[in-house]
A protein has these predicted regions:
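Ubiquitin-like/PB1-type beta-grasp interaction modules and other compact soluble beta-rich domains
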Residues: 1-80
Length: 81
């Protein structure tokens, strides 16, 4: 199934793109998707512990089971004040 991954902020800079489409086997999780992303863009792996994941407008856990046509957003932690 096709899943679109969108990168924000520093992760977009490291990935060298704002988004990528990946073909993902059914019943895979957000954690599985991250491994696929890291295989294509190894520089993102160093951010693994702090990456926030969202599906559409909702933050999701790494155990989230992907659905066909999902748009997954990857972003670094939000900072500011």
């Amino acid at each position: 199934m096709k899943v679109r991954v969108q990168f924000f902020s520093r992760l977009r800079d490291l990935a060298g793109t704002s988004e990528m489409d990946l073909e993902v086997p059914e019943r895979k999780t957000a954690a599985d998707l991250l491994e696929m992303v890291y295989a294509k863009t190894p520089a993102l792996r160093e951010w693994d512990k702090s990456i926030l994941i969202a599906s559409s407008l909702d933050f999701v856990e790494r155990t989230y089971v992907l659905k066909p046509g999902d748009e997954i957003s990857l972003m670094p932690p939000v900072q500011g004040g």
